[in-house]
């Protein structure tokens, strides 16, 4: 593990421990809600994992956006590393959202995915763009053309973030009654 600092290994271990503890507490000790009062199944606890995944994926897309702009503005190696890091994190957290969301949807509304719902489909497209970015980085020869293409697709992916946020906001309508 040449080139990996001791502090990096310790921070990674600490982060993974924190994530595991959060998962454990989210499913066992999270505040309980009377399901009969809230008309919600016991599966609501998945939201303690699902919602942070979503916010972290949006933050990862901000890293991807900043990296893409830095790459186009200065051909910065730091910008390219931000693109790589942002796309990896966005895929990790995006898959967490796409996996945990249907669990909640099945329990709450009886369907795991509603193909007519703009926010679900936009977020699915966003995760698909991220998957493409990660796979393209691994399968294409590293060069300026490849980096330009990946940065452009990263900018497109970031453009979907405000759409997802706009349609995810519960203020326009109560999401539980929209089904």
Model regions: which residues?
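Hydrophobic cores of alpha-helical transmembrane segments in multi-pass inner/ER membrane proteins
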Residues: 53-67, 124-137
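Membrane-interface helix-loop-helix modules in multi-pass inner-membrane proteins
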Residues: 89-137
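Alpha-helical transmembrane segments of multi-pass membrane proteins
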Residues: 18-34
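Membrane-interface helix-boundary motifs at transmembrane edges
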Residues: 73-84, 140-147
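Short aromatic-rich membrane-water interface segments that cap or initiate transmembrane helices
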Residues: 41-56, 114-115, 119-121
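Conserved small/polar residues in nucleotide/adenosyl-binding loops
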Residues: 167-174
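N-terminal membrane topogenic signal
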Residues: 1-14
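Hydrophobic alpha-helical membrane-insertion segments
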Residues: 153-166
């Amino acid at each position: 593990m040449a080139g990996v600092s001791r502090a990096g290994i310790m921070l990674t271990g600490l982060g993974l421990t924190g994530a595991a503890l959060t998962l454990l507490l989210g499913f066992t000790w999270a505040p309980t809600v009377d399901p009969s009062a809230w008309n919600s199944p016991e599966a609501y606890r998945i939201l303690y994992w699902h919602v942070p995944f979503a916010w972290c994926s949006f933050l990862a897309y901000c890293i991807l956006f900043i990296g893409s702009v830095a790459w186009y503005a200065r051909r910065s190696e730091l910008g390219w590393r931000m693109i790589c890091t942002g796309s990896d994190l966005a895929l990790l957290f995006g898959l967490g959202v796409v996996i945990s969301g249907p669990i909640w949807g099945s329990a709450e509304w009886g369907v795991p995915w509603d193909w007519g719902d703009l926010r679900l489909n936009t977020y699915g497209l966003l995760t698909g763009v991220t998957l493409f970015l990660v796979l393209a980085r691994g399968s294409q020869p590293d060069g300026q053309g490849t980096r330009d293409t990946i940065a452009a697709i990263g900018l497109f992916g970031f453009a979907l973030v405000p759409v997802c946020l706009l349609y995810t906001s519960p203020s326009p309508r109560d999401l539980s009654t929209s089904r």
